[in-house]
Amino acid sequence: MNATTEQEAIVKVLFTTTEQGLELPESKRLLLVPADIRRYGLSRVLNSESMLNTAAPIPFDFLVNGTFLRTTLEDYLKENGLPFEKTVTLQYVRSLVPPAYEASFEHDDWVSSVDLLSATSSAGKWSGSSFLQGQDRILSASYDGLLRIWNGSGQALATSSVVNRGPLCGLKSAKFMSSTKIAAAGLDRTVRIWDYTEADDHFSGQLKPTLELYGHRSIIESLGVDGSSRRILTACADGSIGLWTTSKKLAPEAPTALLPQTYATKRRKGSTTSANIIAQRGALSLIPVHSRPVSAAIFDPQNQHTAYSASQDHTLKVLDLTTSRVVSTITTSNALMSACYLSNKSAPLIAAGTSSRNVTLIDPRESAAATSVMTLRGHINVVSSVSASPDNEYSLVSGSHDGTCRIWDLRSVRPAAGKEETGLGSVGESVYLIERESLGDKKRPLAGEGVKVFDVQWDKTWGIVSGGEDKKVQINKGRNIISS
């Protein structure tokens, strides 16, 4: 600083960006700015006539060494022990837009699972021409054993019939396979396929069970689906992975020993009729993979023969579905409670929610030098669900038993620091926190008691939709929550 006072201090900055169409000419990238400037001031500078000369102001955020600038440049330099003479590289990106609360849909019991149907969702794309424009729907599964289909106005268009009564009725997972087909499973160890039809006015619908898939001997924790190939993956509490098809012709017969007693008796006597019996089938394969419950099983969207399974035994397995064999095993430090696939140009990544309250990013390739790429910290209870952004490859949302959802931007990272973060590699912190609206003005219980989030999904049309212990589906929307 020498001859200048703190009030007069200036800092040389170098502006960079990966935003297409918003690059500065080489001659304008270096600039002297006041040391006390903040994000808003920097954003105004960039939008000015002498810089980008934007037709309308674009709000920007700025990354410095992988973290968002939330102070003045002066404070940043002081906090990091850097001289004012240092050139600061600022990567500018379009500002993050907070997800705004939109609506909640009431249920009679805990909401265990949600899935989304829209023109931009996987199920909408799998539906092809059968998907009708504007037929955006939410699927919810609950511990009362019921499936519900909702429209955007909060109207329950259809509710499934009760298949089981008693302690085994609860559902753990449900997925759209198309606009007319749904897969669901849970405590009774059975996968059920439902056909969904709507009335001509689209104000009511009907759910009809058409196929039951038997093979597991324990609770089914979650489902992975690929509507294009009509296949389903199941993650079972007994440590096994199931591969199934919804094609009655291709699926093998169901094992008689696992069928409900009434049906098994009728089948032995040859008295079954198509009029009163839902078709039953078995698994294409059941793979004993893990030593503890499997939390998630997901298809690789880039390779139809590959799948991934995450387990409470601390491992992520890469599976060859053609041979039903484990290709590789990646051991982590904690029990894995959820997982999703992140599309990435440089390498595939699996985001796994853990029992240690973190989200771990894992490179599943055998050739990877380091399997744990990054750790996302911020939750204070188990991370029960993760979902990738529909807009880009560097953001995701997580849901936790602490009663919150957190949005993460993987461009904002820092090196691990201190004993607490030893071995975590790069560390990321959330950019937004979504609370449960059901709390109202009440303070959130520390461990999330009463408002635990069990599932969250992110779709370009719907936004972020979550369900949980408060018996509600909650919708939070925001255009370009994290801009691509």
Curated annotation (Swiss-Prot):
Pfam families: NLE, WD40. Transmembrane segments: none annotated. Component of the NOP7 complex, composed of ERB1, NOP7 and YTM1. The complex is held together by ERB1, which interacts with NOP7 via its N-terminal domain and with YTM1 via a high-affinity interaction between the seven-bladed beta-propeller domains of the 2 proteins. The NOP7 complex associates with the 66S pre-ribosome. Interacts (via UBL domain) with MDN1 (via VWFA/MIDAS domain). GO terms for molecular function: ribonucleoprotein complex binding. Gene3D superfamilies: YVTN repeat-like/Quinoprotein amine dehydrogenase. Residues 11-94 are annotated as: Ubiquitin-like (UBL) domain. GO terms for cellular component: nucleoplasm; PeBoW complex; preribosome, large subunit precursor. Keywords: Nucleus, Repeat, Ribosome biogenesis, rRNA processing, WD repeat. HAMAP family: WDR12. Component of the NOP7 complex, which is required for maturation of the 25S and 5.8S ribosomal RNAs and formation of the 60S ribosome. WD repeats lie at residues 121-160, 166-204, 215-254, 289-329, 331-372, 378-418, 448-484. It comes from the Eukaryota. This is Ribosome biogenesis protein YTM1. Its main location: nucleus. InterPro entries: G-protein_beta_WD-40_rep, NLE, WD40/YVTN_repeat-like_dom_sf, WD40_repeat_CS, WD40_repeat_dom_sf, WD40_rpt, WDR12/Ytm1. It is found in: Nucleus, Nucleolus; Nucleus, Nucleoplasm. Belongs to the WD repeat WDR12/YTM1 family. GO terms for biological process: chromosome organization; maturation of 5.8S rRNA from tricistronic rRNA transcript (SSU-rRNA, 5.8S rRNA, LSU-rRNA); maturation of LSU-rRNA from tricistronic rRNA transcript (SSU-rRNA, 5.8S rRNA, LSU-rRNA); protein-RNA complex remodeling.
